[in-house]
Amino acid sequence: MLKKTVLVRALQVALGASAVAMAVTNPVMAQSNASGNIYGQVETAEGTTVVVRNTETGLRRVATPEANGRYQVSALPVGRYVVEVMRGGAVVNSAEVDVNVGQGTNTSFTAASVQSVKVTGRRSRIDISNTNSGATFTARELAKLPITPTVASIIQLAPNTTRGDSRYGDGNAPSFGGSAASENAFYINGFPVTNVLFQVGASELPFGSIAQAQVLTGGFGAEFGRSTGGVINIQTKSGTNNWEVGGSVSTEPKSLRSAPKNIYYPNNGSVTDGKLYLYNEDNERSQHIANVYVGGPIIKDKLFLFANVERTQTDLQNTRLASDSTAAINTGWEERKDTTNRALVKMDWNINDSHRLEGTYIKDDPKSDRSYYGFNYGAAAVSGINPLDRGYEKKGGAYYESYGPTPVAARVGAEIKILNYTGNLSDDVTLTAMIGESNTEHVYVPFNFRPGVFQTTSSPTTRIPGLNYVTGQPVTGNLLTDGAFDKQNVMSLNLQYKVGDHTIRMGMDKNDIESKAGTSRAGGGTWSYLRATNPNLPLGPNARAPATNGGNGTAGYYVNKIIVSGVSTPSVNQQAQYIEDAWQVTKNVLVKAGVRNEQFTNFNGDAQAYVSMRHQLAPRLGVTWDVMGDNSLKAFGNIGRYHLQMPTNVAVRAAGASLFTQQYYTYTGIDQTTGAPTGLQELSGVTSTNNEFGQSKDPRTVAAQNMKSLYQDELILGFERAYSPDLNFGAKFTYRSLKSGIDDFCDSRPFQNYGVANNIAGAADFASSCFLFNPGEDNDFMVDYGSGQLTPVHLTAAELNFPKVKRTYAALDLFAEHPLRNGWYGKVNYTLSRNKGNTEGQTRSDSGQADVSTTAVFDMPELTLNSDGLLPNDRKHQLKAYGYYQFTDQISVGGNLLVASGRPKNCIGNLPDSYYAAGNPATDYGSEFFFCNGVASPRGTLGRQPWDFRIDMNAAYSPSFIKGLVIKADVFNILNRQVGQNMTEAYNTGSGVNPLYGNVISYTAPRSVKLTAEYNYKF
């Protein structure tokens, strides 16, 4: 057997590491989602200390190695560190390493041949201490790659991710591992920033504030929860001991942007086949981004400041309505200005070497101001000739803040405040705590809207002769409620304790969420001017006849004051506790075993719980094996369960309050400013036909009793190999299976059958509202059959007649990586995957439905027929490659490649004629079934959208004569390949063929060029 030192020297030569050996044994490590660790081994423990010092802030930690030479330093802020081995007051070895968020950095030392010689080492690219899957990107790496400055573009660099449907999150809501776009968790400095109302997308920060972005695609430990998709974990920059200022300006000019494709009617046998549907080729888009930052020490080594502000302005001119819209002649052209102002302020206080406070303030404020003008397609639209004939008189528009045009399509910002504490109580005990809050305001103001002015309706036959009826409120219908908001208060506490070969980590977190959401009648209500045929008859059971008030009432004239509102103030309480043990079973095998216990409680606007899910245990087990004992070959595996909460917005539709009241008056005149009636005399009090006076629904009638949450099981097996200093490669297999889901169903038939069988009065004619339930399982309900009393109803899965939810994701990932060496870095990922089932999850990309967790998928059993197949987020093949090359100190280039097979196609039509039996409620749904022209059309069996092929490139120049200046050009979609991303899948309109069936909804963005000038100055 070789001596240890001889073996290590041989490995050093083999791997090209001239000074620092890779660990022969690996100490137990447990990572935090807001920091990283350094661990390793020294040759001689006696009389040795290991000093870890941040090169930029001076933060200093000292560790005493164990008898076997192992050491670890936990809960370190991300950044660059010097690790020094001290003996007899002198440095005998050292290494300079990077600490990444949520990861361990192995820094081990062998006996130096001359102990007084200081040696600088290089860390391994493989983290043996981690069992999760994903990728971490530093600010330096992101600056080199040609990507747009959004979190969504970082996510797409990672394997097992794809872009979600373009109708979600303004096209920036990703899918991880076949999950829905609402099933991800986003964190900034440990604080959850996911959109709490719909869970689609998240608040962001100035892109230049990102120090590191960790994208976890699976296998995450017990500390992470509330995700069955992926986790995005961002750490922000901090100030250092050197003052630094800088900024950048970038522009994507419309003159360097290629024209987007027109959209034409598909060829499906309709008279419109091949004709122009949406004219796009004269659409214009430009974007300008300005970013300024400052950072430095308030007190050297103690107190630091980093502040960053960013403004993004996007100007668009485009058609917004298609050629089949009669409204296009007035509002078919849009001029739009989107502005997003973002800011971050970070304060770091190193109280001493063992205690640290971090305060973070983030502001993300997206706004959109849209003006609508006329667009005349005219006869030219039929021939396909350029039909551009826009008007210049503004006839419509809208203003949005964190909203619109639909709730799930919006980018949603927030104002966020976070306070983090880290206490290294000893070498073996670390305590971390976090408290924070976020606030979001949603605003929607249509063009010409007059707050507080009621809408009016009348006809010539209902108007009093001689009076002038005016329209005071130009906006009709319902609007987002005034003062809509989301608030979130968060706290977490974590304790890590090392004892022997075990590092035990435990903690808890609590999220309290409150929202005001829903819609109400624009202006507050409607004045409906009416005339009774017989003025002497009462208008209703609780209303008098118009003639009883005399005057115009004797001729039957009266007005109805209508108030309609679906506004609710729902709230959610989310809590979790976890414990995890990282056990170094042998010198080469690490086992992480943990369990997470989740509790979700959703309340209606009256603070009554309508769903409460407790004791949801999620076991997690991860194993890593350092096969060669030198960190050059890692085999790993994971198995675990993951739960997901329901979004807050479910309460608005399913459990929210409903207000629909009427009150009758006679009147004598019309206000010429508002159109409201004057001279009112009551004919009735406030009435409501269905007793809708703004009270919430009985929470017991909203959802099945004792529901289980949506949860998923996952298995991951893989390996990573550091083959040489120039090559890492690996493979990974992932399997995910959805075990339970929550959706609503609206079928009265099971309740009718139960009531008839149990002799309940009125059961045969019972009309059910929608219930939340677990599809494919037995469910218990509380039902009012019309008596005002609730009846317990137990329905088996067979009686409900729904299949069990099914969603599986199986993937094989292969990667090869050239670490940053000899001036270049590159990585290639290939994924072969299959995403199959009868539900996408909480969203429904088939139609872009906006009702997260209350989709139409399980409304009726007939909707599930033929629904098992390839799901919308399935991409059978994906090849991702990115990297950069530094030609000289002044010139570098970068590239980013995506090659992906297209999304599966569906034909979703009417039920066949045989289902149109009397009383079948499913026939009311129209084109929502997996039948095409009366024939079964199983999900995902009609081919795919075209292959997506995108190449992005950049070039950067840093002139030596102006230190700190960087000039860069990025070209996105350099080949200008525009392919369909999704299509209209509804086959029928009424009983006929939908002329838009097969129509492209969105294409790949056309080629564009971004020019950037950046300047950084260090004092």
Regions flagged by a language model, labelled:
Residues 586, 590, 730-907, 1012-1016:
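Gram-negative outer-membrane beta-barrel transporters
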Residues 28-120:
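Periplasm-facing N-terminal accessory domains of Gram-negative outer-membrane beta-barrel systems
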Residues 726, 739-740, 744-746, 834-836, ...:
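C-terminal beta-signal and adjacent terminal beta-strands/loops
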